[in-house]
């Protein structure tokens, strides 16, 4: 908190303003209230820090990143939406625990809009430079990590997709 002038000439500004999501409320239900807040603050913050890189983390992050871009008039290269970055970290963490390896060896990403429409392209998931199925089947621990691909993948995706909502509850 503070005054907009406190951010004058900042290199990076992180936008966290917005109403918090309530239990059972979707990110998209937050949209109008948080768009109105963003419309109010954007001209003021951009005026004092026109050259900053802006990182949008308020929900719904994808909508607000787009709105911030349109309102601010700043070039795309100055605006970052956190999007599915947190979801990707959750996915990598779940797979690392499942395979008992470092998350550094998990190469997997979540795509789409942060929230209910996100998805994991399983054909691109690699563990220690092997496709997830190859790694799973060749692991000395394979009896413990056997799974039904379709159900296991769906369960992991659902966990990743709903974890943010669990924090709110």
Language-model segments: what does each one mean?
Residues 5-6, 60-62, 113-116:
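Short, internal active-site loops enriched in acidic
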Residues 72-78, 88-169:
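C-terminal substrate-binding/catalytic lobe of Rossmann-fold NAD(P)-dependent dehydrogenases
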Residues 17-19:
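Conserved NAD(P)H cofactor-binding loop of Rossmann-fold oxidoreductase domains
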Residues 26-93:
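Rossmann-like NAD(P)(H) cofactor-binding subdomain of soluble oxidoreductases
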